[in-house]
């Protein structure tokens, strides 16, 4: 069965989570009451799942999530916290967590979330996901606004499948100039490939 690490600075919470998961057949491989200890246990035990409060001492939970991700462990993170989901769920997702459950929820919700996360799904409050999606759309809108008129034109040509040579002929530019525009556009839109540019253009109905 899956191996679980529990990280919370409240012993009663750790005990409740341990009992819940052990009853369901999970193996608890460690507990920690602070971020530094959590990272040590994670390195040593390589748990499948870390159930983590973000309001913990020494190293806060958001930093723990980021460090676990940088360590390239196969540990999925499920946040269990009293913090406001609207404010902290997006931050947890951006840091690398795969789930977020409020301590105000019934503990059975935590078990459902854990199973979803271990199966490869994300589990976040619906309102928080809407907030995350809106933030992403706002960021992309600002990226588009940073493009010059000429860059926007080149983007549309690229997104429609035109080669640098074809674009150069259409716009009476050199291929080198088109290539420079393409590089600038990819940098401004944080796209790492032509496919990424096309996806971006499609999301914003430019093609």
From Swiss-Prot:
Residues 155-174 bind DNA. Residues 140-205 form the HTH luxR-type domain. Residues 3-118 form the Response regulatory domain. The modification 4-aspartylphosphate is found at residues 9, 53. InterPro entries: CheY-like_superfamily, Sig_transdc_resp-reg_C-effctor, Sig_transdc_resp-reg_receiver, Tscrpt_reg_LuxR_C, WalR-like. It comes from the Bacteria. Transmembrane segments: none annotated. It holds the Pfam family Response_reg. Keywords: DNA-binding, Phosphoprotein, Transcription, Transcription regulation, Two-component regulatory system. PANTHER family: NITRATE_NITRITE RESPONSE REGULATOR PROTEIN NARP, TWO-COMPONENT RESPONSE REGULATOR. Probable transcriptional regulator. This is Putative transcriptional regulator.
């Amino acid at each position: 069965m899956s191996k679980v690490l529990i990280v919370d600075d409240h012993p009663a919470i750790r005990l409740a989570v341990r009992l819940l998961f052990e009853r369901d057949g999970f193996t608890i491989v460690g507990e920690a009451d602070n971020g530094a200890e959590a990272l040590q246990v994670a390195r040593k035990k390589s748990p499948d799942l870390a159930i983590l409060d973000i309001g913990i001492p020494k190293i806060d939970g958001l930093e723990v999530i980021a460090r676990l991700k940088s360590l390239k462990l196969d540990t999925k993170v499920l946040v269990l916290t009293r913090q406001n989901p609207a404010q902290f769920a997006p931050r947890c997702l951006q840091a690398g967590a795969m789930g977020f459950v409020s301590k105000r929820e019934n503990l059975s919700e935590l078990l459902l979330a854990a199973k979803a996360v271990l199966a490869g799904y994300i589990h976040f409050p619906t309102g928080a996901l809407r907030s995350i999606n809106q933030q992403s759309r706002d960021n992309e809108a600002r990226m588009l606004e940073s493009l010059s008129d000429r860059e926007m034109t080149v983007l549309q040509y690229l997104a429609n499948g035109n080669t640098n040579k074809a674009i150069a002929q259409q716009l009476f530019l050199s291929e080198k100039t088109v290539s420079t525009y393409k590089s600038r556009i990819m940098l401004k839109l944080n796209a790492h490939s032509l496919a990424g540019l096309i996806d971006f253009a499609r999301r914003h109905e430019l093609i």
